[in-house]
Amino acid sequence: MINIESSTVKEPADNLALSNAVRPGVVGWAKTIARELGPEGVTVNTIAPGRIDTERIKEVYPDGPTDEDLRAIPLRRLGRPDEIASVVCFLASDAASYVTGSVIQVDGGLIRSLL
């Protein structure tokens, strides 16, 4: 099982009180399910994308991200949808058979939290 969340699960965003309250609950649920389904060989992980170049990001940055926005991301660019897809493919593969209950950031280094 692979959940798609948001990098804001680790660093809440301003003006998104409801979203900031719900997202950690989804991660807690996923970690619980990972423990419950682990004995059956089922892995459960969550991907936390950062700023990905999608239609949604165009709503956030109608004129495109500014240089300041990009400087906040250590890799200095928006992510691409195929980069999220690559992580999904990895988690769905046998190579990730011992990865469960994890939250994997795919955010170019944007979020600075240690955990």
Annotate each language-model stretch with its function.
Residues I73-I84, A95:
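A conserved structural motif in NAD(P)-dependent oxidoreductases
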Residues I2, V44-I47, I57, G101, ...:
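Hydrophobic structural elements of the Rossmann-like NAD(P)H-binding subdomain
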Residues E11, V88-C89, T100-L115:
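Short C-terminal tail/terminal secondary-structure segment
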Residues S6:
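Residue(s) in the substrate-gating loop at a strand-loop-helix junction
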Residues K10, V27, V44, A48-E59, ...:
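Short, flexible catalytic-loop segment of classical short-chain dehydrogenase/reductase
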Residues V22-R23, A30:
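Active-site helix of classical SDR
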Residues R35-P39, S97:
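Alpha-helical segment proximal to the catalytic Tyr-Lys
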Residues N15, P39, R51-I73, E83, ...:
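A glycine/serine/threonine-rich, flexible loop-to-helix segment
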